[in-house]
């Protein structure tokens, strides 16, 4: 609860210090060492708003513009859709587990929004998708200009196995709008989603993020809030070794963020979500 109250106050302060400025792009080919350390192939985009020039830092600019399935990073906008459509009332509503064993203990239990986000509980979001419907989902996607805005699918969930796709650059654009409460949804819903995204918090910083994985590639997207400005990030990597590669997402991002002092060198003093 203390973290949540601090997060709200800190966000208000951070937003108050935000000022628009011209932004350039700087290729960071030297970041290859972080990917090489973990034998990973991928891209990362970092938008550092602490700096006066507000540079967009990119490793592998070509890949950063290539669209991939958002996988569970889509839970960020999907939660907004569900709240707006009335598929869920608030973070306290309980979704009863149907008793089907889904191979992961975190999924085999009753859920609320917080646990569904933390555990990436797909079945809860499948309920939302059914309630929202394809036509309304398409309208929402176009309304927020999310990737290719295509929720079509021949089999499975459209955000994992369907046509929906988004690039790392586009993830950054979406996250920035959410951070500033500029998406076409109620401000209280945007604030709730940001609260659900909290991973860690220190004395003067907050890390909000979401993982994603569709089998062949994985994401970690989010931002770190500081009093001097926020640092947004979107990474995707190939995962040829499947689950054995998943730890690399956060490991690479954390190493890069620490290298630019966007995360402290030591582990966070508080953790609100196991990833």
UniProtKB/Swiss-Prot annotation:
E.C. designation(s): 3.5.2.6
Keyword flag Lyase: no
GO molecular-function terms, A-Z: beta-lactamase activity; penicillin binding
N6-carboxylysine carried by residues: 75
Residues given in the record as substrate binding sites: 210-212
GO biological process, one term: response to antibiotic
Signal sequence bounds: 1-21
Reaction catalysed by this enzyme: a beta-lactam + H2O = a substituted beta-amino acid
Keywords, alphabetical: Antibiotic resistance, Hydrolase, Plasmid, Signal
Protein known as: Beta-lactamase OXA-2
Organism phylogeny: Bacteria, Pseudomonadati, Pseudomonadota, Gammaproteobacteria, Enterobacterales
């Amino acid at each position: 609860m203390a973290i949540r109250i601090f997060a709200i106050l800190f966000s208000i302060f951070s937003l108050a210090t935000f000022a628009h400025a011209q932004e350039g792009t700087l290729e960071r080919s030297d970041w290859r060492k972080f990917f090489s350390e973990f034998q990973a192939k991928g891209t990362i985009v970092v938008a550092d708003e602490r700096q006066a020039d507000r540079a967009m830092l990119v490793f592998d600019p070509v890949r950063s513009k290539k669209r991939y399935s958002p996988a569970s990073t889509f839970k960020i906008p999907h939660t907004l859709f569900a709240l707006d459509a009335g598929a869920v009332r608030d973070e306290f509503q309980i979704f009863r587990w149907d008793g089907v064993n889904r191979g992961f203990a975190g999924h085999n239990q009753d859920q609320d929004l917080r646990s569904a986000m933390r555990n990436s509980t797909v079945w809860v979001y499948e309920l939302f998708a059914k309630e929202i419907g394809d036509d309304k989902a398409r309208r929402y996607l176009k309304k927020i200009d999310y990737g290719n805005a295509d929720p079509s699918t021949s089999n499975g969930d459209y955000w994992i196995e369907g046509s929906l796709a988004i690039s790392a650059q586009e993830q950054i654009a979406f996250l920035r709008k959410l951070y500033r409460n500029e998406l076409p949804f109620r401000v209280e819903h945007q604030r709730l989603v940001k609260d659900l995204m909290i991973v860690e918090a220190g004395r003067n910083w907050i890390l909000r993020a979401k993982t994603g994985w569709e089998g062949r590639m994985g994401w970690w997207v989010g931002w770190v809030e500081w009093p001097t400005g926020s640092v947004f990030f979107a990474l995707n990597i190939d995962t040829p070794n499947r689950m054995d590669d998943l730890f690399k997402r956060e490991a690479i991002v954390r190493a890069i963020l620490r290298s630019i002092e966007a995360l402290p060198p030591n582990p966070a003093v508080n953790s609100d979500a196991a990833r």
